[in-house]
Swiss-Prot record:
It is found in: Nucleus; Cytoplasm; Nucleus, PML body; Early endosome. The keyword Transferase applies. A zinc finger (B box-type) spans 91-132. Residues 298-492 form the B30.2/SPRY domain. InterPro entries: B30.2/SPRY, B30.2/SPRY_sf, Butyrophylin_SPRY, ConA-like_dom_sf, PRY, SPRY/PRY_TRIM27, SPRY_dom, TRIM/RBCC. It comes from Mus musculus. GO terms for molecular function: DNA binding; identical protein binding; transcription coactivator activity; ubiquitin protein ligase activity; ubiquitin-protein transferase activity; zinc ion binding. This is Zinc finger protein RFP. Belongs to the TRIM/RBCC family. Homomultimerizes. Part of a complex consisting of TRIM27, USP7 and MAGEL2; directly interacts with USP7. Interacts with PML, EIF3S6, EPC1, CHD4 and EID1. Interacts with MAGED4, MAGEF1 and MAGEL2. Interacts with PTPN11. Interacts with autophagy receptor p62/SQSTM1. Pathway: Protein modification; protein ubiquitination.
Length: 513
């Protein structure tokens, strides 16, 4: 490449597209372009959101930029090379202003071209000096290295941006699918309710017709009777006002006709109509209660799913610590299952091991933050799970209660669920626990338990005071039958459509060997 072309390329790479001058404090944007800090300040003003790149016009939701120190260094080198560029015919450098000798050398300490007299002077004595051409080639190589680095970073940024755009498109596609599902489900629900509405309204129309047909004849008869009575009353009123001779004429017949009129029986609504209306009212009441229960259950289920999902965001990988296991507890090779055996293993009685009760602790330890894991208890008749402080007594008997550093729930005799508070709290569960979720919020002092199968909350220990690291806690004993099955720590990846934990905002200490 000709030197002029190289110079032009260097000039373009180190020039701000806004002020068209050498970069001063270049700042890299998310789109990969570089702009002077002052130029960005003029372009963006006081705006903090929805700012755009002055070069490509890509819009960013928030104001975000990073100093590009590599480009700043390259710019300084290019500016320095321009000031040191050979001048005059033949491409020779100028002369030293002090000694009037050609500038053929370069002092690395002072970063300036010097002449041979300067090289021998006291000012540059002991300095590292290179031929000017060699120094220029070195600088060009440095510039090229930095340009290569910047181009690699730019390409990487472009790939990251493409990955972000792809992720955004995929996530938006998922939300669109969920949106379509919601619209479809509610349309089906709407059509179903509309059909029930039409049926009920049609039944009301039938009732209206039955009422009209049943009562209309009686009403017509009453109307005729009323008309007849009106005529008779008019005759009697007229007779009452007649002179004596006329009044006495046909008086017997007139009074006889009046006496034959009987008082009507009390009105009685046809019983079959009353029964039909009562049945319909019961249907409407059932409809009202059903819709109310449906709405409440839907809201409750949505809240349950949300609460459990929020806990599952903090899922951690829990394993069993064999150094803590009671000798009758058999651990699986992957340290995720534990079962009880009547035959005790010959294990060292190290300080960490429980020696009286069939207990084992999990790893890791937790010293802050939020953490969630799940345990498959199956049909076991007796078990205890939860958390405990790492400092709990391992030797001899100890009551599993908060004052002793334990926060756990337990099943006794296959039917009695208890929260091991002090005193204990009975848990009247509607369905047996098969899979239990444990959520530890260390900083808030809370330990919560969930029925994962039913997606509902079971119990929460509040206002707990943790004195040091906290660990998962497991205890079980043998009762025969199905209860001989192991407790299983469930792998969290992919459970119920959940893929791994999004983020564990806390701290833990690994304790497994």
């Amino acid at each position: 490449m000709a030197s002029g072309s190289v110079a032009e390329c260097l000039q373009q790479e180190t020039t701000c597209p806004v002020c068209l001058q050498y970069f001063v404090e270049p700042m890299m944007l998310d789109c990969g372009h570089n702009i002077c800090c002052a130029c960005l300040a003029r372009c963006w003003g006081a705006a903090e959101t929805n700012v755009s790149c002055p070069q490509c016009r890509e819009t960013f939701p928030q104001r975000h930029m990073r100093p590009n120190r590599h480009l700043a260094n390259v710019t300084q080198l290019v500016k320095q090379l321009r000031t040191e560029r050979p001048s005059g015919p033949g491409g020779e450098m100028g002369v030293c202003e002090k000694h009037r000798e050609p500038l053929k050398l370069y002092c690395e300490q002072d970063q300036m071209p010097i002449c041979v007299v300067c090289d021998r002077s006291r000012e540059h004595r002991g300095h590292s000096v290179l031929p000017l051409e060699e120094a220029v080639e070195g600088f060009k190589e440095q510039i090229q290295n930095r340009l290569d680095h910047l181009r690699r970073v730019k390409d990487l940024k472009k790939r990251r941006r493409a990955q972000g755009e792809q992720a955004r498109a995929e996530l938006l596609s998922l939300t669109q699918m969920e949106r379509e599902k919601i619209v479809w489900e509610f349309e089906q629900l709407y059509h179903s309710l509309k059909e029930h509405e039409y049926r009920l309204l049609a039944r009301l129309e039938e009732l209206d017709l039955a009422i009209y047909n049943s009562i209309n004849g009686a009403i017509t008869q009453f109307s005729c009777n009323i008309s007849h009575l009106s005529g008779l009353i008019a005759q009697l009123e007229e007779k009452q006002q007649q002179p004596t001779r006329e009044l006495l004429q046909d008086i017997g017949d007139t009074l006889s006709r009046a006496e034959r009129i009987r008082i009507p029986e009390p009105w009685i609504t046809p019983p079959d109509l009353q029964e039909k209306i009562h049945i319909f009212a019961q249907k409407c009441l059932f409809l009202t209660e059903s819709l109310k229960q449906f709405t409440e259950k839907m809201q409750s289920d949505m809240e349950k799913i949300q609460e459990l999902r929020e806990a599952q965001l903090y899922s951690v990988d829990v394993t069993l610590d064999p150094d803590t296991a009671y000798p009758s507890l058999i651990l699986s090779d992957n340290l995720r299952q534990v079962r009880y055996s009547y035959l005790q293993q010959d294990l060292p009685d190290n300080p960490e091991r429980f020696n009286l009760f069939p207990c084992v602790l999990g790893s890791p330890c937790f010293i802050a933050g939020r953490h969630y894991w799940e345990v498959e208890v199956g049909d076991k008749a007796k078990w205890t799970i939860g958390v405990c402080e790492d400092s709990v007594c391992r030797k001899g008997g100890v009551t599993s209660a908060p004052q002793n550093g334990f926060w756990a729930v337990s099943l006794w005799y296959g039917k009695e669920y208890w929260a091991l508070t002090s005193p204990m709290t009975a848990l009247p569960l509607r369905t047996p626990l098969q899979r239990v979720g444990i959520f530890l919020d260390y900083d808030a002092g809370e330990v919560s338990f969930y029925n994962v199968t039913e997606r509902c909350h079971t119990f929460t220990f509040s206002h707990a005071t943790f004195c040091g690291p906290v660990r998962p806690y497991f205890s079980l004993s043998y009762s025969g039958g199905k209860s001989a099955a192991p407790l299983i720590i469930c792998p969290m990846s992919g459970i119920d459509g959940f893929s791994g934990h999004v983020g564990n905002h806390g701290h833990s200490m690994e304790t497994s060997p």
